[in-house]
Amino acid sequence: MFGFFKKDKAVEVEVPTQVPAHIGIIMDGNGRWAKKRMQPRVFGHKAGMEALQTVTKAANKLGVKVITVYAFSTENWTRPDQEVKFIMNLPVEFYDNYVPELHANNVKIQMIGETDRLPKQTFEALTKAEELTKNNTGLILNFALNYGGRAEITQALKLISQDVLDAKINPGDITEELIGNYLFTQHLPKDLRDPDLIIRTSGELRLSNFLPWQGAYSELYFTDTLWPDFDEAALQEAILAYNRRHRRFGGV
């Protein structure tokens, strides 16, 4: 895809002409945002939830089809217990205070990761959100919770190996497409499983085990903006940066 963009002559601002179908977001910087305001880290996580609502509505309006947010990694369990407990309770608050509006805007909510290991109240809140929005046809909001990319691939290989042993598939049948059918993103339409654009906030320049298989050819966008400050204008700027690029997929 050639990343063309145009300028609105009336106001001289760039307007995206290509909107990425699937955007992955590493929502980083909540703790630093809170620290700058002399508040506890959990204060930043709460503000980050507000930012997610804002960005999801903006993306839905722009025509983005999927957003996958890195909400909690398999490595995040090593954080202080109080912080982990607070984060695990956020989906309950999200369901009560934010899901009704997303549902009204036709957003479909799903979760990916090793979700069977989540606390009961966390899993139940997200399951209720999935059930409530399952028939919606707008943007799909994927929550990656207790997610790790290497663990995802490892689990997929184990499942494929078992299916080979059970004679459900032959080794010769194993292709990249088949492996994709065993990953956590298997519920997505095949043409939407891989992010076109991955955004990481807070200035960190790494992917931290986020969608390593699906993101092989994703365009990467890093911004110093802390996640709670990432708003509709910041999303527009990320999409404009995406528009300026030429995706070659190994070609020329």
UniProtKB/Swiss-Prot annotation:
UniProt-annotated catalytic positions:
28, 76
Query: Which Pfam families does the record cross-reference, listed alphabetically?
Result: Prenyltransf
Q: Which residues form a coiled coil?
A: none
InterPro entries from the UniProt entry: UPP_synth-like, UPP_synth-like_CS, UPP_synth-like_sf
Q: What is its EC number?
A: 2.5.1.-
Look up keyword Magnesium and say if it applies: yes
Which amino acid positions bind Mg(2+), per UniProt? 28, 219
One GO molecular-function entry: magnesium ion binding
Write out the entry's keywords from A to Z. Answer: Magnesium, Metal-binding, Transferase
List cellular component terms (GO).
Answer: cytosol
Tell me its cofactors: Mg(2+)
**UniProt subunit comment:** Homodimer.
- This chain's protein is named Isoprenyl transferase
Species assigned in the record: Streptococcus pneumoniae (strain ATCC BAA-255 / R6)
